[in-house]
Amino acid sequence: MMIFEKKPILYSLFVFTGSTIGITAKILQSIKSYGTSFKHPFMYSFILFSSETTGILTYKYCFQKEDEESLPKEESITKMKAQIHILTIPAVFDLFSSFFGMLSYENLPASITTMFDGGNTICVFLLSLFFLKNTHSKNNFIGVFLLIIGLFFISLSAIKDKNNSVDEESENKSGFVQTIVGIFCCIFCNIFTALHAITEEYIFKTRIIHPIKLIGFEGLFGTIFSFVFILFFSHIKFSRSIDFLCIKDKETGNVYIENFYIAIKQIIEEKQILFLLVLLFFLFIIYNYCYITITKVTNATTNIVLYNLTALFIWIFFLIPIHKQENQERIGILQCIGFLILILGVCVYNDVFTKNANLDESEIKNLITETSQITDDSLVI
């Protein structure tokens, strides 16, 4: 695990796995099997949380002994009892975040959806300001303002290119409606992602808990919750007026937001789906470890900012003219402008332009001391 302690490697793995997950999810949704696309938002959540559950075994056999020895025994037991139930809160937030995230992938181009994650930074900023009472600089406020402008241009780009996101199953619906629904799904995803990140940051600040332990038990609760939602929605029929959000049973003609039985039939009929789901499972393991470790060693906002970098790689991948028509993307002026403003906003938010120019008081004193020493040495010579 020493490799994850080096921040450049940690950040690189985070961005790489995040990009690959987005690309894989978009490809999965375009695969037709059993007469419909593989659109199962809670199924993706189930895969995500199942991968997180492996953290329980990792913690037990790799970290538990060292972790418990670092605290007095009685305090360790008290903390352990207090920690388990509280992890249901971030698990619920993560469940709804992944649900709305997958719905946005279904209704918007992959790069647009990923760029909208810039809204996570805005939500984390606001929540940390009001709930964690974190202090923010003037650059943070300017950065958030630029992020809002950037997202506005990206929204205009998505609406302008609405026809590019309309597939065969939604020909009876306006591409405009589908795009607006996708944008709102992105907004809800941002809110729940921010709540999830802030909750985890709060837990780290108020509890003594190993990050792998947090991943494992959060995944356990999330797996249970997502499976319950899968079974529940498998028996709930929806109106065909929202069929662009749903999967259709080719035998009965009914449409569902989620259906476990159709998913199994699709996996049996198309083996590529099974391969990509297994790939997602292992990608999630690496990604989640990086995610929680970055939150532990830095803060939730840094975590979100790094994830925004994946948009560039996803966009480049889907610009290559090798994809199905519904996945193929193109370079749009509004999207380029919005993305550049997003990058500028992220840089301003993180003081990239001023961080190296500003010296604190101790650094100034050290610089004066070193300069004086050099001057004295020159006089001696």
Outline where the language-model segments fall:
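Polytopic endomembrane small-metabolite transporters, centered on the Drug/Metabolite Transporter
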Residues: 1-381
